[in-house]
Amino acid sequence: HPLLQDLPKDFTVFHWHGEGFDCPKGASIIAETQAWPNQGFVYQTPKHKQRGTWVLAWQCHFEVTKESLPKMVSNGNAAIQSGLKDYPETVQAPDEILALGAKYVEENNARLATMFNRIAASANK
């Protein structure tokens, strides 16, 4: 899809959710994980098609920053601990979340900025 043309086929992005979603009829799934089959989709209503615009939806967090991640982990520690007990195969320990965040957060912020710029450019055509 043109809005996603520079995204790698596989990449690591931050997840913090315990629920999934069904895609709208006619949507194209653009991302999935082993734990959650629907992680993102693109979609066009008839009005979007007329305008040449798209709905782009993600169930992951490109917007997490090096500053916000420790706050999220601290404030969400009870949820993390519960998740570690209930879903140990998909929930990571706080130290692992912070280490992986430090590794991936900047490239994901750049990916988000690129997607936003493409969305804005497509809306201005």
Where are these regions (language model features)?
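Acyltransferase
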Residues: E63-K125
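Pocket-forming structural segment of enzyme catalytic cores
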Residues: H1-E67
